[in-house]
Each structure stands twice: as C-alpha cells, then as structure tokens.
Amino acid sequence: MISIEGLSKVFSLNKKDIKAVDSLTLNIENGDIYGVIGYSGAGKSTFVRLINRLEEPTSGKVTIGDQVITELNKNDLRVARQDIGMIFQHFNLLWSRTVEDNIGFPLEIAGVDKQEKARRVKELIGLVGLEGREKSYPSQLSGGQKQRVGIARALANSPKVLLCDEATSALDPETTNQILSLLQDINEKLNLTIILITHEMHVIRKICNRVAVMEQGKVVEEGQVLDVFTNPKQLVTRKFVEQVMSSNEDSDISTIIENYPDGVLYRVHFLGETTNQTLISQIAKQFSVDLNIIQGNITQTQAGSYGALVVQVTGNESEIERAKSFIESQESVELEVIQHAK
C-alpha cells in the first residue's frame, strides 16, 4: 500500500509562499489504478513528483510498502526509485538512442549484464507492442509509439508502482485509448499499482477504480470512480463529470414537458450493474405501455455503467403505475418523476 500523510510543498516566489500541495493525505491499495484529476495549477503534477522525491516535500510523509520514502538518504532513495517507474507527457526519450537502447538505459545504469539486459528489453518490447521497431529512433516514431517506449523504459527494473504524469495529454483520442488499454493490460498482468495524473475525466472513467479530485493543492473529493460520478459533491467535480456526460438535461426539461404533454415523464438513473437496454426491454414486454426515449446519456466506468434516460410512458393509468413500481423495485436504478399524467 502507498500511504501519504500530510504531504505539503511550498514554493517561494517574489518573497511570497505558495502552497502547491497542501496537507494531502491519501491511501492507495496495491494493484489500484488510482486517478488524480484537477485543472491546471491544482497541484497534481507537483504531488506526483513528491512521491518519488523528484520534488522534495516541505513536510509530510510518503510510505510505499514498508519504506518511508521521505526519510531515505540519497543512496537508499536511488535504490528505492528502481521500484517506482514514471512516464511523462512529452516522453523524455533519448533522441540519439534507438528504441531498444532507450528501454535498456535504466538497466544499463543499474549494472545489469548485457545478456540479461537484452532478454529484458526483448520482453518489454513484446509487452508494449513495439516488435519490429527495435532499431528505430524516436524521430521515426508516432506519439503513441514514443509513449510505448516510455512505458517500457519505466517498467525496465520491474517496479511495483508506475507514476503517469499527464501521459496521454499530447496524444490524439484514438491513441489515448490505445495507451490507456495498454496501461490497464499491464496493471492486470503485473499487478502494478498505477497513479495516473490527468485533467481529463474520460481518462479516469476508462481505467481508474478510484479517483481524487484536486483543487488549489488540496484533495476536495475522493472515492470510488462510480460513486464520484453518481454523487459529485464539489463544483469542480461536477464540472469534470459533465466532460463525459455532456448533459444539458436540466435546461431542456421545460422544452421536453412542452413537447411531450401526454402520459408520464420519468428520468431513470442507472447505477452500476443494471443496463438501460435490459430494463427498457423488460418493461416493453411485461406491461401494456408505450415507451419513448426522449433524451439520455450512459457512460461506462470500471465499476459499471452510470447515466440517465428521460422516458415518456403512455398507456392505461394502472399499467403505467405497474411499470413505475417495477422500475422502482430494480437494484441500482433510481426513478424521478418529471411530469405526472394529465
């Protein structure tokens, strides 16, 4: 487990103290893909650099396993960093070295013999899907391929933790999804703990199981990704959730009521395991009502789906009431009546 207690970083600028990270406390379990999200200036990149002491903390404590990272001397820290891999937004590759030489560089520094280094590099090239690119230079690679080299290099010493600082921010959407899928695959194969820094909620949604939301150097909200999606408490969190939900339902409701005056209007919220397709199909088969899906958005997280549909239900009043009771009886579904039958 990674334990972070009261971690702070203060920078002095023009004789003023600026708290980039302010008394941050988190616990991250082994094997987690843990997302940290925030807008520019929230302190998230400073925070991740405090974990491996690329930035020295002003105060606080970082413990990884049974090692207190913040108390290590320089020599012990150098050894401990072999268990902490890191990838960056702009790849940080050595441009005069080939793919295989970039990946093997940490092994070279660690004094690994040539035969073992060659074996490990070949293994990593296969893991990240770069077969055939061994002799290529960074200038000959796409952005996604460069990041794959960065990931392989970060894994060279078989770390227990991988820090990802905006690792997909410089990539197009399709390549971003490919890199996220690769990270998820590596997490599952190696039981690697991943801490992922981002300003994009769809990155959190796609692969993270827990998330911390940072604002002005502090964690303002933290929890399971699905819980944060379904019940965001802070304004900054709601803004991030809107990135992936793209919902303007509230502003449209008056128009919907005006355009669909018949029957009943429900907003049905789906949480976790229940799928909208299954529920709507069951209602159509079991009850003598007509269903009209007017508006909706469903998104997937690692823990299940989340979203809402606005549905018009018309038919016999007793059948509408039976359908309503059926919806309310379902687990992981919440029903909100927007407009009663006239």
UniProtKB/Swiss-Prot annotation:
Positions annotated to bind ATP: 38-45
CDD domains: ABC_MetN_methionine_transporter (cd03258)
Membrane-related topology note: Peripheral membrane protein
Keyword terms, alphabetized: Amino-acid transport, ATP-binding, Cell membrane, Membrane, Nucleotide-binding, Translocase, Transport
Enzyme Commission number(s) of this protein: 7.4.2.11
Coiled-coil segments: none
GO cellular component, one term: plasma membrane
Pfam hit, one: NIL
Keyword ATP-binding: yes
SUPFAM superfamilies: ACT-like, P-loop containing nucleoside triphosphate hydrolases
Reaction equation(s) it catalyzes: L-methionine(out) + ATP + H2O = L-methionine(in) + ADP + phosphate + H(+); D-methionine(out) + ATP + H2O = D-methionine(in) + ADP + phosphate + H(+)
Start and end residues of each ABC transporter domain: 2-241
Top-level taxonomic group: Bacteria
Compartments, record wording: Cell membrane
Signal peptide: none
Family: Belongs to the ABC transporter superfamily. Methionine importer (TC 3.A.1.24) family.
Physiological role: Part of the ABC transporter complex MetNIQ involved in methionine import. Responsible for energy coupling to the transport system.
Protein name per UniProt: Methionine import ATP-binding protein MetN 2
Gene: metN2
